[in-house]
Amino acid sequence: MTVLATEKDSVIVSMGPHHPSMHGVLRLIVTLDGEDVIDCEPILGYLHRGMEKIAENRTIVQYLPYVTRWDYLATMFTEAVTVNAPERLGNIQVPKRASCIRVIMLELSRIAPHLLWLGPFMADIGAQTPFFYISREREIIYDLFEAATGMRMMHNYFRIGGVAVDLPYGWIDKCLDFCDYFLSKVAEYERLITRNPIFLERVEGVGIIGREEAIDWGLSGPMLRASGIQWDLRKVDHYECYDEFDWEVQWQKEGDSLARYLVRIGEMTESIKIIRQALKIIPGGPYENLEARRLDKGKDSEWNDFEFRFISKKPSPTFESPKQEHYVRVEAPKGELGIFLMGDDSIFPWRWKIRPPGFINLQIPPQLVKSMKLADIMTILGSIDIIMGEVDR
């Protein structure tokens, strides 16, 4: 970073790398004039693991366990976009029950990262108590994940054409109980935080991003919706079975850190609304006995190549990517998570390009923090919600 001659009395401070449980291994080189920020340069790459090149040397089925290490707090979304890409290329139909289960898991996986965003964000601006509150609700979500997938994190639950296993007996009732419980806790968060005068003093009018500025920078997710743009890929791309549910896109028009907070709080409420509707319409009810259904169905007169390759065979199945290219995206908690996939009639992808929302959103903080106070850096950075696993890949 070059320092101008007129800034010879300025101070250069290195902030970070931060602990992975907070904002990840991100380093900021900040140029200060007293408490005023003159310049800020983010240093990335500390968590780079070559995820794109690894994908090109694995089959898609072999690569599935790797993708949960991108955004390690919202692993269902990385799995979803990974299986959606070959499903689109191969025109594979997903059963309605599996699609409903996917939606339920995705929305639970949206709430959990928003909770883990809220706790450190409040800690960044000096309020420690909410961190303990969000841990209480987040543990219940992880209990539901563990019961359904066997893992609290890094679930490896999605499969090409569906999910790994059906929901266990009694899981849907437990999930409905959580929905009733969690809404009261969101109201508790709002009573505790939203109208707190000290909180408002720290976030209101801080880190303002205008509508056109958000579009020009390619922002997505809560960063985009907090700037007055009603853009949500669940409404735009019509993936899974989101079109069958009644829910609203959460957005604000102020574009500041408070607006980004309000968008995420609203999204948690909308996620509960989607989960309740999915649990209500899921085919087969609380537990579907697939073995009994298969016996009742009898033998199919036509050869089912998909079932032979993905269900009947004991060895690890393979999926040959057709010689096409496709861009698939999902609405992750942090924004648009996309994959550009190029196939060449091989079991290995020819190109696997990851479009992480955090990497794009992290380009704008240097513009936001200029002329702000040093204490506002953590407010702005916290409101963006950064996970370096997906930024560095």
Curated annotation (Swiss-Prot):
Bridged cysteine pairs (disulfide): none
GO cellular component, one term: chloroplast thylakoid membrane
Catalytic activity: a plastoquinone + NADH + (n+1) H(+)(in) = a plastoquinol + NAD(+) + n H(+)(out); a plastoquinone + NADPH + (n+1) H(+)(in) = a plastoquinol + NADP(+) + n H(+)(out)
Main location: plastid
Membrane topology classification: Peripheral membrane protein
Listed Pfam families: Complex1_49kDa (PF00346)
EC numbers on record: 7.1.1.-
GO biological process, one term: photosynthesis, light reaction
GO molecular function ontology, one term from the record: NAD binding
Subcellular location: Plastid, Chloroplast thylakoid membrane
Top class in the EC scheme: translocase
SUPFAM superfamilies: HydB/Nqo4-like (SSF56762)
Keywords, comma-separated and alphabetical: Chloroplast, Membrane, NAD, NADP, Plastid, Plastoquinone, Quinone, Thylakoid, Translocase, Transport
InterPro entries linked: NADH_Q_OxRdtase_suD, NADH_UbQ_OxRdtase_49kDa_CS, NDH1_su_D/H, NiFe-Hase_large
Function: NDH shuttles electrons from NAD(P)H:plastoquinone, via FMN and iron-sulfur (Fe-S) centers, to quinones in the photosynthetic chain and possibly in a chloroplast respiratory chain. The immediate electron acceptor for the enzyme in this species is believed to be plastoquinone. Couples the redox reaction to proton translocation, and thus conserves the redox energy in a proton gradient.
Subunit text: NDH is composed of at least 16 different subunits, 5 of which are encoded in the nucleus.
Family membership: Belongs to the complex I 49 kDa subunit family.
Name of the protein in its database record: NAD(P)H-quinone oxidoreductase subunit H, chloroplastic
Gene name of this polypeptide: ndhH
